[in-house]
Amino acid sequence: MNILIAADSFKGSCSARQVTDTIERAAKNVIPDVTITKIPVADGGEGTVDALVAAMKGTKVSVPAHDPLGRPITAEYGLLPDGSAVIETAAASGLTLLKPEERDALHASTFGTGELIRHALEHRVKKIILGLGGSATTDGGAGLAGALGISFLDKDGKELEPGGVQQQSRLAAGHDGII
């Protein structure tokens, strides 16, 4: 008997890989001689890099970055054999990086995701596949853009602090430092 196991993560508890491994163990307990093919899948959030790297025989790159609240972390993105990078917003800007009491979308930033993109661009990737699921932020990518050299200014020309939707007074953008 052949069984295909294609599963996504269980938010906040198990990665797609953990889910497929658990189902495999359970199936083998019931049908010891079963042949199993596991395919972790993802919806663009957590597990997207793992799924694409596994399916396409890619590798992972670890990069110093910042979490949604600006704390230093190490985050990963994937490199595929065709020269593409796979980056999850969730890797550096995700809900799972925060304790429940820290979750504050109005002050969280996507700056860390921009750091991953910047690293990939500096290493000459040919294409970036960006998964947008699992974000802890509402900054509309302003933090991400900031990490790439774009500044956001208020009506008086002063640079705005990073953050979420509370920065609605943005009226102009500067791009002098863009890579």
Residue ranges and their predicted role:
Residues 1-53, 143-146, 167:
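N-terminal phosphate-binding or glycine-rich loops at protein starts, especially the Walker A/P-loop
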Residues 2-4, 59-62, 83-87, 126-129, ...:
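Structural motif
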Residues 6, 35, 61, 73, ...:
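Glycine-rich, flexible loop/turn motifs
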Residues 14, 65, 69, 77, ...:
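Solvent-exposed, flexible loop/coil residues
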Residues 14, 18, 22, 43-47, ...:
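Conserved active-site and cofactor/substrate-binding residues in soluble primary-metabolism enzymes
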Residues 25-97:
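Glycine-rich nucleotide/cofactor/substrate-binding loop typically near the N-terminus or early
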Residues 72-136:
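Anion-binding (especially nucleotide phosphate/pyrophosphate-binding) glycine-rich loop
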Residues 107-111, 115-118, 122-131, 136-179:
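Glycine/threonine-rich beta-strand-loop-alpha-helix active-site module
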